[in-house]
Amino acid sequence: KVGGVDVRQYDVEKLREEVAMVLQKNVLFSGTIKENLRWGDPNATDEEMQRVCRLAHADEFIQTFPDGYDTYIEQGGSNVSGGQKQRLCIARALLKKPKILILDDSTSAVDTHTDACIRQALRDEIPDTTKIIIAQRVTSLMDADKIIVMDEGRVDGVGTHEELLQSNAIYREVYESQQKGSVPQ
């Protein structure tokens, strides 16, 4: 259901209006940061853009640019880092005010601290938006209501973080290997 309505009863165009998606390989267009953000909502105010950029932790680097939100982005975002592109694309999706937000490995290019800050902001600021998060980093999923473990295109387990640690060997193995990799030497 989306907005309490069975998705099969939605007009496809109306359903598309309710969904925003941010991919790992995202797209920025030639134009200013403002122009790129307004693809999410052409009528967005400066205040709305600043709010979603705070949620996506894009404001941190935008403020360092001499032209701020009027900074020109090269085709494909070649003049910003991968993590900066991802954060701008998350902000753009948030401007749409979707009922469903799909994040497909969309914070893979940011550090774990920034990833955690973005997840916390999304949890706190848009609690009524359904978030579907596809990630390889277990820390990106730990607080989810439901985690689905996929293996070779098939569902291998469903549950919370704690349930899957107890019941799913694949999830447990990935979690443990990532924990070992994050221990300071």
Q: Where do the protein language model's features map onto the residues?
A:
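ABC ATPase nucleotide-binding domain helical subdomain, centered on the C-loop/LSGGQ "ABC signature"
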Residues: K1, Q9, R16, K34-Q75, ...
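ABC-fold ATPase nucleotide-binding domain signature/coupling loops
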Residues: K1-D6, D59-L88, L103-S106, V110-H113, ...
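ABC nucleotide-binding domain signature
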Residues: E13, V19-Q24, I132
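C-terminal portion of ABC ATPase nucleotide-binding domains
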Residues: L55, Q63-G68, Q120, P127, ...
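Short alpha-helix in the ABC ATPase nucleotide-binding domain helical subdomain
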Residues: I90-A91, A135
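A short, proline-enriched helix->beta-strand linker immediately N-terminal to the Walker B motif
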Residues: L95-K99, D128
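Conserved D-loop/post-Walker B switch-helix segment of ABC ATPase nucleotide-binding domains
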Residues: D111-A121
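Conserved catalytic loops of ABC-family nucleotide-binding domains
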Residues: D124-A135
